Every structure is written in C-alpha cells, then in structure tokens.
C-alpha cells in the first residue's frame, strides 16, 4: 500500500515550494529512527510545534550501516518510514542515502532545521548550509537520555538474564 505521506525528494520539493509560497513554515527533522523510542517522539513533537508542516528525512539502510555499524539498521527503511508516517505530528517523510542531510536541506530549504539535544546550534554539521539559504537551526527535544543503542544493550542484558534463569 502506498502511503501519501512518504514522498520522493523530487515530489516533496514541489510540494514544499508551494506550501512556502502560501506562507507556510516548513520544519525539517532528520535521523535514522532505527527502533523508534520516546526520545524520538519528544524530538519530533517539539520540532512539529515550531512550524506548520513537519518533514522528516530518514537515513536509508546503507547510510545507517555506515553511521551505526554493520549490525544496523535493525529495521529496513520501508518499515521505519511506514512507522514514522503513522505519527500524526509528521506531515511528510523522505528517505536520503547520503551520510548527512545536506542535499535534502539544499533541495527543500525548510525555514527551520531541527536537531536533538545531543547538538548545540554551533555543533550542527549542516548549520552553514541552513544559514546559506536564510533558514535557522533549532535544538529541540528532551535531554539525550534515550537511545537505540541503550535499548539494545538493555534488551541483550534482559535476554541473558532470562536465559540464565531458565537454566536453573
């Protein structure tokens, strides 16, 4: 089933330009979103609150593997995008296969580019790109207390404890 929220960059560019011409504020958030957790939800809701439309750019499988390691992603990109598209705070989802979101930013030129609290406005890698077209960077979400890596470690610990309990 085709989800109308999931767009190609080309289709999304035309849509975003039309929305901006009509005075709408576009916010872009990005990430791997491999095993969605409450930290992601808080980040996305806070990003959505800054504008009229929230676009989420999702790393493709190859870029997740390069960024996070050979055992990742846990879920393929088609599943990650479907889950994200189901969230009411998200208006559109687009996949990018590069290691960073610069090409998406240059193409869409959202007024606001959001990053999580593991960044500061000075450490956002794409900040110069965003400034170059007149956009701004916003740091949103709760403190970086949640991560997929921590969830994986806890899950593995629970699994080991469960296995040893069943051997008694």
Task: List where the protein language model places each region.
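Nucleotidyltransferase catalytic core that binds NTPs
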Residues: 1-168
């Amino acid at each position: 089933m085709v989800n109308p929220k999931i767009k190609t960059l080309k289709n999304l560019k035309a849509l975003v330009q039309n929305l901006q011409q009509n005075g709408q504020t576009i916010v872009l958030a990005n990430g791997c979103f491999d095993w969605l957790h409450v930290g992601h939800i808080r980040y996305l809701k806070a990003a959505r609150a800054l504008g009229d439309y929230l676009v989420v750019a999702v790393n493709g499988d190859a870029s997740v593997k390069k960024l996070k390691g050979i055992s990742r992603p846990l879920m393929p990109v088609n599943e990650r995008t479907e889950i994200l598209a189901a969230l009411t705070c998200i208006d559109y989802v687009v996949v990018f296969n590069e290691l960073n979101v610069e090409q998406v930013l240059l193409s869409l030129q959202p007024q606001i580019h959001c990053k999580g609290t593991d960044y500061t406005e000075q450490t956002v890698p794409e900040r110069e790109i965003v400034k170059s077209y007149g956009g701004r960077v916003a740091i949103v979400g709760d403190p970086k207390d949640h991560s997929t890596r921590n969830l994986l470690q806890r899950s593995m610990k629970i699994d080991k404890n469960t296995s040893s309990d069943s051997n008694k």
